Amino acid sequence: MSISHVGLRVRDLDTVKKFYEALGFTEVQRMTVPDKMAAGLLGLAEPIGFEAVYLQNDGFVLQLLTFSGHPAPDEAQRNMVGAGLTHISIAVDDMADAQAAVRSSGGAVVADPGGGFACMVRDPEGQLIELIHMTVRPVPAG
């Protein structure tokens, strides 16, 4: 077995897609799932309006999905102490460039301890993302 993708429910597919493209993701597939199939898979009442965009970055696939027939409810932003998936972590070559891409594509830097090691950002719809310099490495002392 292997992981296929991680799905992220969004309100505005194209706005969020542009944000992740600014961080190096590329679109590999876009689809509209027929209501009957979506109803059977998701247990939602028709009409569903299931649209998805699959984005890829270095082998990782992120599915952005929306359901026009079932608007997303207003919810508090998830944080690191809530149960369940907390964030997506993206390795970056240059922290300053990545932070600039976040800001210019509608996101926000929400925590930055300095030093260029890692920071936390939110996408245009509030999803928490960790930017980490290159690959996982020991946390700096101090």
Which ranges hold each PLM region?
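A cross-kingdom feature marking solvent-exposed beta-strand/loop segments within repeated
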Residues: 36-39, 71-75, 110
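Long, charged/polar, surface-exposed segments that mediate recognition or autoinhibition
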Residues: 76, 81
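Active-site-proximal beta-strand elements of phosphoester/diester hydrolases
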Residues: 64-66
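Core segments of cupin and vicinal oxygen chelate
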Residues: 9-59, 97
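Vicinal oxygen chelate
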Residues: 30-32, 62, 90, 96-142
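Short solvent-exposed loop/turn micro-motifs enriched in small/polar/acidic residues
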Residues: 1, 46-48, 112-114
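A short helix-loop-beta-strand connector motif used in the catalytic cores of GNAT acetyltransferases and
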Residues: 47-51, 84, 116-117
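N-terminal beta-strand motif that seeds the catalytic metal site of vicinal oxygen chelate
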Residues: 1-18, 23-33, 85-92, 135-142
